[in-house]
């Protein structure tokens, strides 16, 4: 199974570099030189090997092997990028999850009252923050004091909200 790891938002320069908005975790591994990515363009799967990777202004700047000119890559703007989910270089620790497993889960408080659904995840220096869309939009820190149970099979998360977290 493959997961979407980003989207090509634009090109950069004339030597075939692309700007990628990542919607994935483990970008330090996924975008390493030598990694194979699949770009889906007009319902066609195009495989590319990463030649270089750097981060600039919050975007991932990639070049692919064999692409040395803007004309070879410009037509891919707006295309989604995928990689195999069970990437051999990624080892999940206990209580560590793929973003794709968490996004879409329904979040409940410890009284089983539904709060909303996870729609996005932000990385911060200390911990990830989950964006929950319910009657309002909530920002929930992924810390042990708040997140009590994650059941990815049933797409269910139980939290114990800190005071003021859901106000």
Curated annotation (Swiss-Prot):
One GO CC annotation: cytoplasm
InterPro entries, sorted: PRC_barrel-like_sf, PRC_RimM, RimM, RimM_N, RimM_N_sf, Transl_B-barrel_sf
Keywords attached to this entry: Chaperone, Cytoplasm, Ribosome biogenesis, rRNA processing
Localization of this protein: Cytoplasm
Domain PRC barrel: 94-165
Main location: cytoplasm
Gene Ontology biological-process annotations: ribosomal small subunit biogenesis; rRNA processing
Coiled coil residues, start to end: none
Presence of the UniProt keyword Nucleotidyltransferase in the record: no
Domain of life of the organism encoding this protein: Bacteria
GO MF annotation, one: ribosome binding
Biological function: An accessory protein needed during the final step in the assembly of 30S ribosomal subunit, possibly for assembly of the head region. Essential for efficient processing of 16S rRNA. May be needed both before and after RbfA during the maturation of 16S rRNA. It has affinity for free ribosomal 30S subunits but not for 70S ribosomes.
Comment text on domains: The PRC barrel domain binds ribosomal protein uS19.
Similarity field: Belongs to the RimM family.
Assembly description: Binds ribosomal protein uS19.
Listed HAMAP family: Ribosome_mat_RimM (MF_00014)
Name of the molecule in the record: Ribosome maturation factor RimM
Organism in which the protein naturally occurs: Staphylococcus aureus (strain bovine RF122 / ET3-1)
Name of the gene: rimM
């Amino acid at each position: 199974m493959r997961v979407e790891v980003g989207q090509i938002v634009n090109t950069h320069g004339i030597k075939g570099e692309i700007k990628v908005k990542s919607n994935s975790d483990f970008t330090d591994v996924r975008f390493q030189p030598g990694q194979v990515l699949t770009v889906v363009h007009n319902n066609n799967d195009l495989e590319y090997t990463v030649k270089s990777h750097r981060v600039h202004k919050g975007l991932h700047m990639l070049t692919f092997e064999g692409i040395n000119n803007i004309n070879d890559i410009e037509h891919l703007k707006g295309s989604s990028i995928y990689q195999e989910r069970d990437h051999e270089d990624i080892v999940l620790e206990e209580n560590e999850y793929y973003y794709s497993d968490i996004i879409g889960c329904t979040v409940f408080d410890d009284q089983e009252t539904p709060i909303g659904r996870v729609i996005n995840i932000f990385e911060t220096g200390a911990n990830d923050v989950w964006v929950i869309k319910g009657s309002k939009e909530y920002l929930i820190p992924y810390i042990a004091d708040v997140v009590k149970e994650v059941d990815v099979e049933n797409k269910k998360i139980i939290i114990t909200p800190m005071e003021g977290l859901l106000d």
